Design a protein with these regions (language model features):
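Sec-type signal peptide cleavage vicinity
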Residues: 2-196
């Protein structure tokens, strides 16, 4: 009887330690959802998109193993919605992956998603400056109703290296690529003319 109780106690202890480990793993950075924070830069006489009116954008993410050089799509042209001030979340939940470096790029075209043959992202391309990767707009046309803003989320090193704790929000700073402008002309001439 004592032997049976001892085995039962040992089994409970082993099972408890296994479930405790699973709970600890959930707290790791690598299992946390990818979230975003944004800032919209002000352009001189910029159009409609401002920090307060900015409600959604679309994002590309590519990742690679730290030890490799080939980048792969983590997600492509995914809508990200503003939940509250400083709190943004993609429509689908994506998680950080251990030992992978991530690079991000995003855009907003008013309330409209652009087709993937118009906008694309390649994290392996480099440009001058602090950001890496290139967000490309090809054959983009506008009807004049929207501002086009774009931003890169690569100012920080988004690589999980085994640390525990809270995962950082991806910082996206958007800049106006094309802005809707309104021109007002004033004249002292009469509104109507007589033609003889």
């Amino acid at each position: 009887m004592r032997k049976g109780l001892f085995l039962l106690g040992a089994t409970v202890a082993v099972l408890s330690s296994c479930s405790n480990q699973e709970v600890m793993d959930v707290a790791d950075y690598a299992n946390q959802p990818i979230e975003f924070s944004t800032f919209v830069g002000k352009n001189t006489r910029a159009g409609d998109i401002t920090q307060t009116s900015f409600k959604k954008f679309w994002v590309f993410a590519q990742n690679k193993k730290v030890s490799e050089s080939d980048w792969h799509n983590a997600f492509t042209n995914v809508q990200v919605n503003k939940i509250s001030e400083g709190n943004w979340s993609p429509v689908n939940t994506y998680f950080w992956e251990a030992n992978k470096e991530f690079r991000f790029a995003g855009y907003a075209n008013g309330e409209s998603q652009l087709d993937e043959n118009i906008v694309s992202y390649d994290a392996s391309e480099t440009t001058t400056g602090t950001y890496t990767g290139v967000l490309t707009f090809k054959d983009y046309t506008t009807d004049g109703t929207n501002d086009l803003v774009a931003g890169m989320g690569n100012a920080n090193d988004y690589t999980w290296k085994g640390d525990a704790g809270e995962a950082p929000a991806v910082e996206m700073t958007f800049h106006h690529m094309l802005s809707k402008l309104t021109f007002t002309f004033k004249t002292k001439m009469a509104d109507t003319y007589d033609v003889d």
